[in-house]
Structure formats: structure tokens, C-alpha cells
């Protein structure tokens, strides 16, 4: 039984979880995290490439194309401000570490998408947002009741109400202005210390917020789904078309 692939998958998953923790805590992921992840996994990848080269060199050219494609795509999305630098580096590293789609013990269960693993991770990451929206809607209908949904449907699908002391790592859908008037916005704003102090001053217990989750969390989710199931977006499109 070949344990190289699952070992590499586990190592990368641990690094991604660590990156999520750092991003949530300090909003920054040092470059050394990605360097260490490459150092820990490249020996396995190099050996796997050597094995493939003996059997079929054509696959190597396809793998090289996939790596170049993802590196360029990740950089382009970063330049377009679609996500942060850490997210781009994570995708680039995944492209290098997994030039071939990992296939072991019957996984992935559904498919391999277009055969470019990092691309499947990215597409899975994107569909996590609507899934989270349905989860928030279900939660809010139970916790807040259906009546409020008619007044503020956006808040029901994109946020939730929390106590003031738990605002950390959330953006505000509602806050108090300088005169103490309650303001509600469609685009959540990052809370300042002044905003938080004002809410406490007027003894506001709860406000509507949206989670300010770093995209690396979505990437980690997409990674796990790509390993176990495959490319979900590719599967959905194949069912429709």
C-alpha cells in the first residue's frame, strides 16, 4: 500500500489549518509557512514525478501546463483584488505540490474535474459561499423568526446578530452614528474602536454583523472537498449541461 500520497495530503492539510489559524488571529500568514510546506512535500512530489516519467512523459507536459496555468491565474486574481497575497501563495503552492490530481484508496469519489487539482480546490472554494448563505438563512429563520426576513432579507442570508463583545472578526451591518442614531447598511463596514465604544455607551446588546472570514478558510474547505469528492462545480455543471 502506497502511503506517499495520503502522507503528503495530510501534511498540506495541517499547514492549511495552521495558515487559517494565523489569518484569523493576526490577519497575516508569513511566507515561511508556504516555504516550509514546500520543503516538507517537494521530496514526495519529486519522487512521484519520477515514477510517472518512467511510464508516461506526456502526462508530465500536461501537469506542467496545469502548474503554469494555476500560477498565472492565482497571480491574476490577486492583482484583481479577488483575495489576498496569502491566498494566492496557497494556490500556487498547491499547484506545485500537486501537479497531478491525487488519486488513492478510491478517492476522489466523484471526479477529478479538469484534472488540475489546484483549480478544483479554487472552484470548490467559490461554491462554499452560497452554501454558507443557505446555512445562515436557516439559522436566522430559527433564531430570529421569519418576520424579520421580510424587512432585512440581506441580513438573514449574509449575517447574524451577535453580542457587542463578540464583534471581533466581524463587519457591521448596523451601527450608531455620531448622534447616536442607528444606521443600517447593505455593505457591511469594518468596526472601529469608536463604533464599538459608541455601541457600548448606548447599551446596545446585539447588532447584525457578517463574518469577516479570510479566503484561506474557503481554500482549506475546497482542498478537503477536492480530495474526498472531487470538483463539485464541475459535477454540477456536468449534470446541467
Give the ranges of each region predicted by the language model:
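A membrane-topology feature that recognizes alpha-helical transmembrane segments
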Residues: 1-241
